[in-house]
Structure formats: structure tokens, C-alpha cells
């Protein structure tokens, strides 16, 4: 290769490096900073743009769970929201809207690939990454939320905010996104609530695992519920909103026991590993994925998949 060829390679390398650096820098400058920052009142309709990372995860065009936009290509949700990972072509996400149904401000993106931890069983390792088939365009109503900064010790505030279109106290599913401030409860304190005899039986298996924590108001009966699963527990830390929890499960929404959340910090290394090893065309641009989609679609037409676990 001559000097001209080496020069071209060097320019390509520098361009790729600069693009990667700029993208990372830009993400950190916009994540967790909603344009609309008005006063939040709990247990009511959310304002448009207040939670711009909120996702409506749809299976076969119907809302099934919540989720959180964490970059221009990735969404984080709960693993139990995913019926079958090879059904990725039937999943889409709805962004930029507070309406459960379609609206003029929202935009739909299709899922090209799904990643779930190998150790996921029922409520354990209840976390999933969804790669979108096209890049998300950020706006005043579509922005990512920051992930926890594992390079330094973060102090989780006494209360955070849960959002979603889940079932309310009347048993109805609201059409408008709901927001609720909930107190954060440590894993140990929550374990005593869910497993009161555990203190007398130290060998008894824990209910609240090391990758879980709780949040919710026991007395006021305010909590996340069915339909909120996979949605964010957003905490305001160091001037930005960070995704500290994913709505996972609970028993009888808002009745004496708090909701249980997957601890995002616990899975931060897993998240980084999945995203870093996914090349630009991972999933959506794959010929194998396209041909598989047609086959899977015909299989899906002839088989009714089971409902996902939806305790939260």
C-alpha cells in the first residue's frame, strides 16, 4: 500500500474515532435533561416532554409494557415483557407521546434485536435490552435518560419517580401517561416486608435478590402496577435524571407491599458489554434476520404465545 492509501486509512480511523467520541459526548450532554421542567405532582397525568425517555413497548401494535430510551439506538425494559426473543420483528416502541394510543407527537421505531441475561428466570435478572432498527432523532419530547455512573458512588435520593400507563386503583388502564413519586426502600428492609419469617430462618432463600430493590408508599397505596412493567424508576441525582430501576414485579399493586424493581446499577457492566459488542448493523441490517422474520411471522400466525408475567 502506498503513502496515499495509508493517508486514506489514517483519515478514516481518525474520523471514526472522532465520531465515536462526539457521539458519546453528545449523549452525556443531553441525557436526563428534559426540556420541559415544570413542577411535578404525583399520581396524575404527566405533561408532554416531562419524561422524554418514556417508552411504550408494543407487541403486535398493542401496548404491553413500558421502557426507557438510553441512547439513540437502545431501549431498556423488563425481561418478563418479552414473550419470545425471536419475535423481535413483532415488537416496536412508541416515543415522544404521553398517549397510550398513537398521537401526532409520537414516533414508532421497530425492534431489530433483543438481549436478555442468560440467568433470567421469572423475576430474577428481569432486564432486557432492545436494539432499534433505525436511529432515534432526539427532540424536545424524545430524549434518553442517563444510566447510573458506576465510576463513582451515587447516593440514591429518598424518593424517585415511576411513570407508566399501568392499571390504576380503579382497575382501569389510563390513556395518558401517569407519574408518581415513590419512596425508595432498601433491599434489606424490603426483604423483611416480603419475607418476615426470614429473620428467624437464615437459611431460607431470599425473596428480594441482590439485583433488586423496592419503592412504594405502603400507607397511601400508591405503587406501580400491571402495565407499568419495564418502565423507568427515574431518580434526580447530581442535576440529571438517572435510570436507577426497572419496574419488575409486586403483589397486589399498592396493597401493603412496595413494588420491586430491577437494580440497573447491578447490570451496568452487562449493559455496556452488550452495547459495545453490537456492530452498527447488528440485527436490523442482517439478511438472516430478514429471512427469519418471514418464517417466524408465519409460525406466529399459527400459534398463540403465552402471556408474559405481569405482576407489576
From Swiss-Prot:
Family statement drawn from the similarity comment of this UniProt entry: Belongs to the peptidase S1 family.
Active site residues of this protein: 80 (charge relay system), 126 (charge relay system), 229 (charge relay system)
Compartment(s): Secreted
Signal peptide: 1-22
A cellular component term, taken from the record's GO annotations: extracellular region
Protein species of origin: Mus musculus (Mouse)
EC number(s) per entry: 3.4.21.-
Main location: secreted
Glycosylation sites: 149, 263
GO molecular function, one term: serine-type endopeptidase activity
Name of the protein: Serine protease 48
Keywords for this protein: Disulfide bond, Glycoprotein, Hydrolase, Protease, Secreted, Serine protease, Signal
GO biological process: proteolysis
Statement: the UniProt record of this protein carries the keyword Disulfide bond: yes
Record lineage: Eukaryota, Metazoa, Chordata, Craniata, Vertebrata
Amino acid at each position: 500500500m502506498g503513502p496515499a492509501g495509508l493517508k486514506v486509512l489514517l483519515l478514516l480511523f481518525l474520523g471514526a474515532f472522532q465520531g465515536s467520541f462526539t457521539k458519546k459526548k453528545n449523549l452525556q450532554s443531553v441525557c436526563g435533561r428534559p426540556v420541559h421542567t415544570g413542577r411535578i405532582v404525583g399520581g396524575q397525568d404527566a405533561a408532554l416532554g416531562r419524561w422524554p425517555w418514556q417508552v411504550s413497548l408494543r407487541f403486535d401494535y398493542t401496548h404491553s409494557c413500558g421502557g426507557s430510551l438510553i441512547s439513540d439506538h437502545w431501549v431498556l425494559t423488563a425481561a418478563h415483557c418479552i414473550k419470545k426473543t425471536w419475535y423481535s420483528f413483532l415488537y416496536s416502541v412508541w416515543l415522544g407521546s404521553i398517549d397510550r394510543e398513537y398521537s401526532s407527537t409520537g414516533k414508532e421505531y421497530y425492534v431489530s434485536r433483543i438481549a436478555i441475561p442468560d440467568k433470567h428466570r421469572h423475576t430474577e435478572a428481569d432486564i432486557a435490552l432492545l436494539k432499534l432498527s433505525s436511529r432515534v432523532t432526539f427532540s424536545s419530547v424524545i430524549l434518553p435518560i442517563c444510566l447510573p455512573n458506576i465510576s463513582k458512588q451515587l447516593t440514591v435520593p429518598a424518593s424517585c419517580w415511576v411513570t407508566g400507563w399501568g392499571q390504576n386503583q380503579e382497575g382501569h388502564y389510563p390513556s395518558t401517561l401517569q407519574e408518581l413519586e415513590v419512596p425508595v426502600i432498601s433491599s434489606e428492609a424490603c426483604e423483611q416486608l416480603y419475607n418476615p419469617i426470614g429473620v428467624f430462618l437464615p437459611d431460607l432463600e431470599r425473596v428480594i435478590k441482590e439485583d433488586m430493590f423496592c419503592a412504594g408508599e405502603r400507607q397511601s397505596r400508591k405503587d406501580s402496577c400491571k402495565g407499568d412493567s419495564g418502565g423507568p424508576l427515574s431518580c434526580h441525582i447530581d442535576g440529571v435524571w438517572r435510570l436507577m430501576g426497572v419496574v419488575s414485579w409486586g403483589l397486589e399493586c399498592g396493597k401493603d407491599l412496595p413494588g420491586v424493581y430491577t437494580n440497573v446499577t447491578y447490570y451496568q457492566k452487562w449493559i455496556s458489554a452488550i452495547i459495545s459488542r453490537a456492530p452498527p448493523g447488528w440485527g436490523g441490517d442482517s439478511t438472516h434476520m430478514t429471512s427469519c422474520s418471514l418464517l417466524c411471522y408465519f409460525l406466529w400466525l399459527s400459534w398463540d404465545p403465552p402471556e408474559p408475567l405481569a405482576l407489576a
